[in-house]
Amino acid sequence: MKELMIGNAAVARGLYEAGCRYVSSYPGTPSTEITEFAAGYDEVYAEWASNEKVALESAVGASLAGARSFTAMKHVGLNVAADPLFTAAYVGVNAGLVVCVADDPAIHSSQNEQDSRHYAEAAKLPMLEPADSAECLAFTKRAFELSETYDTPVMLRTVTRIAHSQSLVETSERVEPPLRPYVKDAQKYVSMPAVAVKRHVVVEKHIEDLRKYTETCDFNREEMRDPEIGFVTSGAAYQYVREAFPNASVFKIGMVYPLPIERIRAFAAKVDRLYVIEELDPFIETAMRAAGIAIAGGKDRTGLLGELSQYRVRKAMGASLPPTKTLGENLPGRPPVMCAGCPHCGLFTVLSRLKLTVFGDIGCYTLGATPPLNALDTTLCMGASFNMLHGYATVRPEQAKNAVAVLGDSTFIHSGITGVVNTVYNLGVTTMIVLDNAITGMTGHQQNPTTGMTLKNVPAPKIHIEKLCEGAGVPAENIRVVDPNDMAEMTRVLREELAKDAPSVIVSRRPCALLKYVKHGLPVRIDAEKCRGCRACMKLGCPALRFAEGKVWVDEAQCVGCGLCMQTCGFKAIEEGKA
């Protein structure tokens, strides 16, 4: 049956049809929906792991147990999982194991623009790269077969446009292979030096076998048309090339590691001028040049930054550009902002007022760095804020009382706990704030270990942030739970904890305003006669407030009656809503 699917749904369908039994992932745009769609299949066990490293390690365990297993993560998540990834190449598999990584060219929702193809080469793992939803489904199924044939995890790489674009797929029934028996084999699975040195030989043999395989497999194909110009490309870039130059000859790469160098060489001999079109790093181009294949152009034309497009490809080639129509007026800008009623707004307003140095982290709250809040000083990676604050305060102890670190509840579980342990163990004196909004918010409301619910909405033990911190050695009297919508109380508690000569944890606890069970109040009302146009309330960054004609106005369609703006108004011009 033919269906229209986004790439992520097609990957999930592929692992379902391949008989995958076990999926463990951590949410990360643009990969999140793969695991959410997989959870919709009753035959597939799917879970949110505490982080990507845990997810991959769990999937390796499921593979050794004899079940086809899968994990998905965004590109920076693969950094977290890199430790088990490299050794998993040595250990190999029992049943098939597929590791999907979703890159984010143009940095739509990430902190960097890294190219994950390098991981395949560095870890010596085969990597497939689909160019549409149909290939997402087909390549996922084939990846399990490759994994079992060559006794290796197989990587599947997508990018944002493939993950979130729709195209037709042909679905089929699920074929579930029986569980493979687990046989103890210390010479394979126990990766200590004496074993690993032997397994390295096996890894190199597998890669050599895969180099032969990629020269004949149908993941890679030659599309001969006009021989005057030829393109070597893969993934989303293939779609741009085909639309920009429909009459050109193309060598489409589906297995990006190992590359089919000899087939590319043969294709190069058939065209007059050869170009390489790929997003981000010159991964394919570098390999071709190293093999002595003459290239008329590549990254010197397309550049290293951002996404490609049909327009950019034609422009890079010096071709005429299609006519465009200019709108009479530009659309208004829509900068990313926190939602109306967001519990983080109150906290960040307090932090901004106190003029503290604030070490930030990854999540919705990263938006606290933007105007008008301007509350965050740094953002590095998941879980970094507590550790960065520790280093900062150790070097500049006189500033320790004027600095805090913030991270979210899901991020705390992901990689924040170790920061608390490190701070306590190394006699740090810092104030760490956990923003507990009862959900993993930025990636679309996923459950996490602090919510008491699994991915499949099964009740689970609720991990208590306060108890974890106390167990890590933070004095119980220095662990405070505060409602961030009470800005006066938050200010008081912050000052108290900053004054202490011991580590402190403040849990800023209020559920995300978008959660279905959260009850909202009536929209607030503005008394126009009392409003002085001072804009103090506008510093909250609430999208339900706007300033026009010298006064503040409320968008009743957005206002949830949280009352934060009432607390900021010195003229009592903002009142509770009335039915």
Describe the residue ranges of each PLM region.
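Flexible, low-complexity linker and terminal segments
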Residues: 1-8, 12, 130-338, 343-344, ...
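Thiamine diphosphate
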Residues: 1-133, 161, 224-225, 283-285, 369-507, 517-518, ...
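Short acidic, glycine/serine/threonine-rich loops at helix termini
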Residues: 34-37, 60, 81-85, 107-114, ...
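Short helix-loop-beta junction
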Residues: 37-43, 241-251, 467-475
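A glycine-rich helix N-cap at a beta->alpha junction
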Residues: 43-50, 91-102, 184-187, 427-438, ...
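Conserved thiamine diphosphate
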Residues: 104-153, 159, 186, 194, ...
